[in-house]
């Protein structure tokens, strides 16, 4: 199983604000684009992917919305608005949740009040962790074994203190090339490399 974690530091956990933030400073469209490229292929979808979207602009707790591709039955269309609607619905269902609770939104989609750090600690038990870094090992030279998990961010870079805690969890820095790419572009390149070599 391949996993992708998108840490959306500026994405609001209020559904209305989320939908209003498309194309604005928070760039919530990044969530939909990354989800689209992680799960879908031409005329189908991948059945071996889980995507965790961690929304951190909140009054209480971060929200982690997880999409398990093999369990999703209907996303309502292959377009930005349909995917953002699914995310907004998960946020609406998460209202009133206390720390580290989980709710099922619909088949293949869950929402949890869990932080990025806590999520990654859990994932480190079953996945090989990778974080994007221009100075990391070129992805074409990296060995992948078992279940790889790729840690991405929105337009706000990962804080330095997060890099240190990720290193302690065994995360490896990998590079997709000399340019800084959007998370959704990283997903496409990662999938392509794994499709060829795994």
Curated annotation (Swiss-Prot):
Where is this protein found?
Cytoplasm
Task: Give the record's keywords alphabetically.
Answer: Cytoplasm, Methyltransferase, S-adenosyl-L-methionine, Transferase
Annotated transmembrane regions: none
Does the entry annotate any disulfide bonds, and if so which pairs?
none
> Which GO CC annotations does the UniProt entry carry?
cytoplasm
- Which EC number(s) does UniProt give? 2.1.1.-
One Gene Ontology term of the molecular function aspect: tRNA methyltransferase activity
Q: Give the matching Gene3D superfamilies.
A: 3.40.1280.10
Mind telling me which SUPFAM superfamilies this protein's record contains? Answer: alpha/beta knot
Among the GO biological process terms of this entry, one is: tRNA methylation
* Keyword Cytoplasm assigned: yes
Residue numbers binding S-adenosyl-L-methionine: 132, 186
Q: Does the keyword Cell wall biogenesis/degradation feature in the UniProt annotation? A: no
Q: Which family does it belong to?
A: Belongs to the methyltransferase superfamily. TrmY family.
Please give the name of this protein.
Answer: Putative pseudouridine methyltransferase
Origin organism is Photobacterium profundum (strain SS9)
